[in-house]
Amino acid sequence: MTERVDPKKLIKGGLHDWEVVIGMEIHAQVTSRSKLFSGASTAFGGEPNDHVSLVDAAMPGMLPVINEECIAQAVRTGLGLKAQINLRSVFDRKNYFYPDLPQGYQISQYKDPIVGEGEVLVDLPDGESITVGIERLHLEQDAGKSLHDQDPTKSFVDLNRSGVALMEIVSRPDLRSSEEAKAYVTKLRTILRYLGTCDGDMEKGSLRADVNVSVRRPGEPLGTRCEIKNVNSIRFIGQAIETEARRQIAILEDGGKIDQETRLFDPGKGETRSMRSKEEAHDYRYFPDPDLLPLEFDQAYVDGLASGLPELPDAKKARFIKDFGLSAYDAGVLVAERASADYFEAVARGRDGKAAANWVINELFGRLNKEGRSIEDTPVSAEQLGTIVDLIGEGVISGKIAKDLFEIVWSEGGDPRAIVESRGMKQVTDTGAIEAAVDAIIAANPDKVEQAKAKPTLLGWFVGQTMKATGGKANPAAVNALLKDKLGIE
């Protein structure tokens, strides 16, 4: 099968066009109260070494005990990724020395992971969609944290994070641009949050990305890849890929060769730096952990977890398009966060879905973004916004008045219907009152009347003047109809 090559995704070098090939390894911290093999807390923060059990500290004679909730969360995630769930998997020891790895090895999964192949459908900013293959998902322990800035001559180790369960989600090298990579991580984070298996908080390190980047001439075999470790924001993922691809292209066009290595991205300097030569699997001397039996469960266990899964973003998006008549773009915006989708659904229930979506996306999200607030922190409840949509639909207020009403509810709260009554915000629907205002505007502007007959677009000016004269309360449809009639405009 010929691989797709999108000319828009190619990077122009000094001599040739180049294709960047990207694979991702996402480390997602499992949402659970205790660690993968101990009962110590997974709470973020706290004093250094506050949440450390004897198992986490690798004290002699301490044996790991599997946390079943972490297993269930991994299976839920696999199901959410439409992946093969392996009924038998094995924990292995990954051997390497690092100061914040007290055992001298990490308990991970190598040959027999808990989750096999799956896929993620990713919507791109340009409206296209791609399918990214998932190679595997395995469980492993997180390491501790080395602190080098506490003392000029010493380094310290905080083991609070040591032993926390991670899901490493490995994609196939199916991504062909930094935009695709960012969209993939965004979609994966959305799925994890819907499932409740990882909070996706990159600032706290709950989601970290290792990015594998190589470049090649279109149609040629894969190039030598470099791995950029621990990129901790979606924006930085994009920057790291662009920077590393340019570095590799410059070397190749200069006649050099790419060394397979692990690199770090420095966002301050906008460059990647060599960290160490890239290890191969045999360097870690994997072997099954003798302290842990193979992990086995039956299909009934998987089916039980599957039955409890929530509606996921793709299914919710399809339903919003079908049930509420939304565009694919609007539905995509609304399902990007589960809380946003739930809010919209509460507003749209029993109402015009398109009108509800318009108010949620344009007015509410616009205001939240302006103030840097999240949907969970909105001062306008779904019930209040739904009432505003009702008042427009009932003809009680116009769209312009509705925006003023939204501002009042945002700032002061209260029942929108009661506010309209108490502040006299109802739109004028009395044709006689509107006609009087229209007649006054026409009488005061005879020159504009003549111009409007020759240039019908001037109707908008008359509408604006009439709305101004009525304090924005006149029914816009009635104003338009009267003006067209009196000015003789079709």
Swiss-Prot record:
It catalyses: L-glutamyl-tRNA(Gln) + L-glutamine + ATP + H2O = L-glutaminyl-tRNA(Gln) + L-glutamate + ADP + phosphate + H(+); L-aspartyl-tRNA(Asn) + L-glutamine + ATP + H2O = L-asparaginyl-tRNA(Asn) + L-glutamate + ADP + phosphate + 2 H(+). The keyword Lipid biosynthesis does not apply. One of its GO terms (biological process) is translation. PROSITE patterns: GATB (PS01234). It is an enzyme of class 6 (ligase). Keywords: ATP-binding, Ligase, Nucleotide-binding, Protein biosynthesis. Its EC number is 6.3.5.-. Pfam families: GatB_N, GatB_Yqey. The keyword Glycoprotein does not apply. One of its GO terms (molecular function) is ATP binding. Belongs to the GatB/GatE family. GatB subfamily. Heterotrimer of A, B and C subunits. Allows the formation of correctly charged Asn-tRNA(Asn) or Gln-tRNA(Gln) through the transamidation of misacylated Asp-tRNA(Asn) or Glu-tRNA(Gln) in organisms which lack either or both of asparaginyl-tRNA or glutaminyl-tRNA synthetases. The reaction takes place in the presence of glutamine and ATP through an activated phospho-Asp-tRNA(Asn) or phospho-Glu-tRNA(Gln). HAMAP family: GatB. This is Aspartyl/glutamyl-tRNA(Asn/Gln) amidotransferase subunit B. It comes from Methylorubrum populi (strain ATCC BAA-705 / NCIMB 13946 / BJ001) (Methylobacterium populi). The gene is gatB.
